[in-house]
Amino acid sequence: MRLLLRHQACLVLVAVLIFMTNLGGYALFNEDEPKNATCGAEMFRRGDWLVPTFNESLRTDKPILVYWLMLVSYTVFGVSEFSARFASSLLSVGTTLLTYHLGRKLYSAEIGFFASLILCTSLLFSAVGRASTPDATLIFFITLAFTCYVWVVAWQRNGNFSGGEQDCEPQQQAGEGSTLANTTDVQSPGSRVEPRPLPMNWRLATPFFVAIGFAVLAKGPVGVVLPAAILMLFLLITFRERDQELEKLKPIAGPWWRRGGSMLRQLFGWERILEAVRGVHFGIGFGIVLAVALPWYLAVGIKTDGNWLRGFFLDHNLGRALSAKENHNGFPFYSLYYLVVIHLSCFP
């Protein structure tokens, strides 16, 4: 317990120094920060918590959550650069702590500590955490979703997500309604058990999907598409490894291209996909996501006669996928640019 408290105190201290120091001491940067902050300020002055505007014109770039957070901050601190950025900084401190608890549950407290320390000191994350943009909010809620998932699975499996020793006490397994609750025996120290999907108990899955609902309010469809794709791929790989251990799959032979094709067919078979969908209650989960996010989308659509929905989904989502926007035209060998930028942005 003392180790956990020391780790968390150290991480909070480092994160607060990185994300809060001189937060309002410089002007809003680039185009996104001024537009987002001004949009929030206009809503604040009107007392409007529903329709985002910039220069009194409808702003369809991003959903409402980043503006709600700004409105709360403006109410407490007044309209300023500091208050426009405060929510992003606070949530980035939260993401740092979530990464610690995610890492210590997956591996160990030491690994979780260094993973979160590396995250909060990386250049791009520290920049995002000091900007009045929705990115820090999206990162926080997706990280929260996966932290909930990992901790619930570990709770169902006596405090252990994937086998081996953990730094937490075993807990009671989930009760009735879970098809996997009684399938895992108590493990001896150092044993290895393959990861299993979230149990068939939708109540335990609720925190995961509630967090995704807020991610959708932060940045739209990417808030559900990204975590759903990650979780689905994890489950499909897990099921394939399980079937290999149980010798349900035929050995793959032949040249590399044939082995690769056979592996993909095994990985993305319909039975395995349906098992993954049922395993984490994607049907019920989609309903939970809608319950969190849909009321505002419906309300803003009605208030603007559908103009906000058309602008956001058709222009800023579908349009961005089909054509260049906001001077992001790309250039030959642009992938090399991202190879360099990714390495620099993750420094040190």
Model-inferred region functions:
Residues 1-348:
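Membrane-integral, polyisoprenol-dependent glycosyltransferases
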